[in-house]
Amino acid sequence: MAWPDLDPPRLAERPLSLQEALFVLEAPPEALPALAEAAIRVKEYFFGRRLKLVRLLNVKSGFCPEDCAYCAQSARSQAAIARYPLLSLEEILERAEEAQRLSARRFCLVAALRGPTPKVLERLGEAAQAIKARFPLELCASLGLLEEGMAEALKAAGFDYYNHNLNTAPSLYPRIATTHTYQDRLWTLKRAREAGLKLCSGVILGMGEGPKEVYEMALALRELGVESLPVNFLLPIPGTPLGDGRTVAGLTPERALKALILFRLLNPKAELRASAGRERYLGPYEPLAFRMVNSIFLQGYLTQPGSPWERDRALWESLGLDVEEGACG
């Protein structure tokens, strides 16, 4: 087929069709530079050359009753990770100060839970109020499934975003988790939206999806209107059901980059984040990825290490990207 129309305003008005998306995902190697430049143009049209730095904090590690196949903290996991109860208020504030020193613009508080308990809501509510009083950080919570009133409590405490990833396509979800459904995740995002929280929701690629499922994920997130969209690439962790790496065998740097391009083109106004696994899978294309996304995670993920801060800084400085600063509104 002919090249699709990749004009940024047009992409904001009308999503790519499945046929156009497959053109991107199945493009030959010689088309990759032009597709990458198109994605970069989209990012710069809507956001300029800004890059937002995001820091994660795992406020409670392990002991999660859910059975997500990718997760080292789940009930099915035998992974050798640190497991600890809910951090104290003082520990959370120390890590917020560290995030500020690293030039982070957003601080994400994550807990391995089916959903937040009253204790978790109280502790993180206190933490949010204290952080907002001291640091110009955007705050995001990722605490599992939300019941009635929980999102409102988080919003009142000062959280700006709620993270709850769709992770994969609806048709594949029963392979990934059985203790909750894809629809449960959609309900949680709906509750967060109705409470006035901005939505952070993304995917984990490399869990057995094909090109059509990648399109399905990207389109679903567009239809949800998520403000923040992390694209993760599976890090197989020994001791988890997906720990043998069989599902990522074909995830080459070219395929990883083309997937990121598609998420950019289908979600031109979303804050796209190159998340877990970028260091491993993007390889020589990581500089291109930095130019087409809005944000990156700093210094690692929930249970896995990431890039040293100095390495990432050298990369964004070499590309002339402007790191976001300033008080959050």
From Swiss-Prot:
Pfam families reported in the protein's UniProt record: BATS (PF06968), Radical_SAM (PF04055)
Cofactors named for this entry: [4Fe-4S] cluster; [2Fe-2S] cluster
Its EC number(s): 2.8.1.6
GO BP terms: biotin biosynthetic process
Binding annotation for [4Fe-4S] cluster: 64, 68, 71
SUPFAM superfamilies with a match to the protein in the record: Radical SAM enzymes
Membership in a protein family: Belongs to the radical SAM superfamily. Biotin synthase family.
Name this polypeptide is given: Biotin synthase
The organism of origin for this protein: Thermus thermophilus (strain ATCC BAA-163 / DSM 7039 / HB27)
